[in-house]
Amino acid sequence: MEPDIKISAIFPVSAKKLYDSWLNSKSHSDFTGSKAHIESRNGSHFSAWNGYITGTNLILQPYGRIVQNWRTTEFPEGAPDSKLEVLFEKHNGGTKLTIIHTHLPNGDEKKYEKGWKEFYFKPMKLYFQKSKPASKAK
């Protein structure tokens, strides 16, 4: 089955930093600009964007992969959770982060793809660019 959404972006930080930031309430809140509560524990519940997003951590493979049940307050009543897979891959001194999002409500794929780009990738690029160590002068 093809994923509903599969998008990637490159960040100028290690997979460890990106992974740890995704699973830390303060960092997740800081890089999205909105309140999040998340733990790096299998089976733990999380919320992001002031409760708009909720779910459960299903699989946590340190610095490589996160799998979550994921939903928003806009999912139709009775709709099952979607599945989110976040992959972290070393890439030219940084990390390629890939979002694979499946089982979204029919017709909502473009809306959520736009959301990932605007409300995650865009602010994350700014956040991690600021946290990148300055280059040393020669």
Predicted regions and their residues:
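A conserved amphipathic terminal alpha-helix motif
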Residues: 103-138
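Charge-dense, helix-prone N-terminal extensions
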Residues: 2-4, 9-10, 16, 43-44, ...
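Conserved short-loop catalytic and cofactor-binding motifs
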Residues: 6, 34, 45, 100, ...
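Hydrophobic-ligand binding "helix-grip"
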Residues: 29, 36-37, 47, 51-96, ...
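Hydrophobic ligand-binding cavity/cleft-lining segments
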Residues: 1-37
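Alpha-helical scaffold segments that form or flank carboxylate-/histidine-based iron centers
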Residues: 13-14, 45-49, 111
